[in-house]
A protein has these predicted regions:
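Cleavable N-terminal export/targeting peptides
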Residues: 1-27
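Domain-scale selection of a single, long terminal region
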Residues: 2-5, 10-12, 54, 62-64, ...
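Gram-negative (and chloroplast) outer-membrane scaffold detector with strong preference
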Residues: 26-27, 37, 61-134, 193-204
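N-terminal targeting signals for Sec/Tat export/insertion, comprising classic cleavable signal peptides
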Residues: 33-61
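Flexible, solvent-exposed loop segments that connect beta-strands
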Residues: 42-52, 80-96, 123-146, 175-191
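Hydrophobic alpha-helical segments of small multi-pass membrane proteins
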Residues: 99-101, 118-123, 146-156, 172
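Hydrophobic secondary-structure block in the mid-to-C-terminal portion of proteins
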Residues: 159-204
Length: 204
């Protein structure tokens, strides 16, 4: 009985070490490529009924796992162009570049289905802001070109092979600006988009 117990304990230790080794072989880096639908909240206090169009954009994120459960994620894309509307009338366009850095908690880091939550900071730079000549002449509009806000996130990675994952990700991001007319503040415009993304990830 003692020999059996000792043998069982030895097998248990070996299996445990094998599991740890298998987990250790999974690299700390995870790179995802996603198609993201950007749905703007369009909260406007200028009285002009400002809004920007919704669109689908490409996105790349790079995650580094500090522990099996905790990761830092940096989200990148190139400057995205949006049309600016007043009511239903197009009055201009702009580009925005919105890198976001988040800290994530992954609930089941060794399972096939790996849900996570995250929170972080978004920095958005607005550029190439243009208005149609009639609006430019009448209002001389300008905007604040930088925005800093919070980001909340929920998502899941689904393992489909050793290093390949399907990813579903949902974020709510605070993005806004101050609108000026002839040098005076006219109000605030908040994009505050809901971002729903689907893509693939590679772990290494």
């Amino acid at each position: 009985m003692t020999k059996f117990a000792s043998s069982f304990a030895a097998v248990a230790v070996i299996l445990s070490l094998t599991g740890i080794a298998a987990q250790a072989q999974e690299g700390p880096w995870l790179v995802r490529v996603r198609a993201v639908n950007l749905d703007s909240a369009n909260k406007d206090s200028t009285g002009l009924g400002l809004s920007v169009n919704n669109r689908t954009i490409p996105e790349v994120d790079i995650s580094y796992f500090v522990t099996p459960n905790i990761a830092a994620e940096l989200i990148l894309t190139y400057p995205q162009k949006h049309k600016i509307y007043s009511g239903s009338t197009e009055i201009g366009s702009l580009k925005h570049l919105p890198p976001t850095l988040s800290l994530q908690y992954h609930f089941s880091p060794t399972a096939t289905f790996r849900p996570y939550v995250g929170a972080g900071l978004n920095y958005t730079n607005f550029s190439a802001v243009n208005f149609v000549p009639a609006v430019q002449t009448a209002l001389e509009p300008t905007i604040k070109y930088n925005s800093v806000g919070l980001s909340l996130q929920v998502g899941a990675d689904i393992q489909v092979s050793k290093n390949l994952y399907v990813n579903l990700d949902v974020k709510k991001v605070q993005i806004g600006t101050t609108v000026y007319s002839k040098g005076a503040e006219a109000g605030k415009f908040k994009v505050d988009p809901l971002l729903v993304g689907l893509g693939l990830g590679m772990r290494f």
